[in-house]
């Protein structure tokens, strides 16, 4: 079976992740800080998932009557949480849109800022298009207006070199089991220096109001921490650029072939190399579910049809009726698997243009 749904999880883990020796939280913080180029490991807070990390971050920093800019690239879970904060605490939300290529509308940001604007909430990488946000540009705008930038990094952690100090992100939320190739059940928050006290103070009334959220901050099992540490050590062993470039090359190869097929429309910004290894397509005459069924049943290829938990992004792209078919590549995929996937798509369309496989 060929697994091309790495945007959701990594099927194959590095040797040593499963069965790793237990690790301490301090060891895991040190490695996390090193991976994300943070000076102080104590600014890392572990949770049990990326979604928990985002929830704790928003609840800690966004309060009653605040206004936030929330990108349409962010997943439905983040939007649902923001809408809950709006309904219960009067938080105001302004959607931050994208253009036809899925690129964030940076020029609109300053005109949307209000006196009560607290934060710009924006995913670092898009799970639909594979686009990566220009965080240096976004955080420069935020700094001019003294706003926080809270970013869901679940698609970029382990998929590119995330240098938090250079990017200027205030609050970076991540998961360990997607591109970082660690075990399920671990995520976290990386805070800019000076924000830890504010984060803790912001959580006090939140945990009093909803004690169940305290479970998100319960210590992570040392065995899971061990697997997580082993995954990061694997990234260091291979080199972050080596880990990132292989999937990127595979995705580029898939894109170059599919864009030559008249019946296939590819979504996203492919005019830059600053991307994650995700390619989403629409195939004329077939629904995403039909494309997926063909890939899986005839060729054993796992891709992902539908809205990918990002319905607002699909609305912005004009693909909300059926969604798209997403192919997301990982470190353990091969060129042969990409060729097989291209061939499977050619078979679906009745093509025999072998140059597409050259």
Language-model features, listed with the residues they occupy:
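Pyridoxal 5′-phosphate
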Residues: 1-358
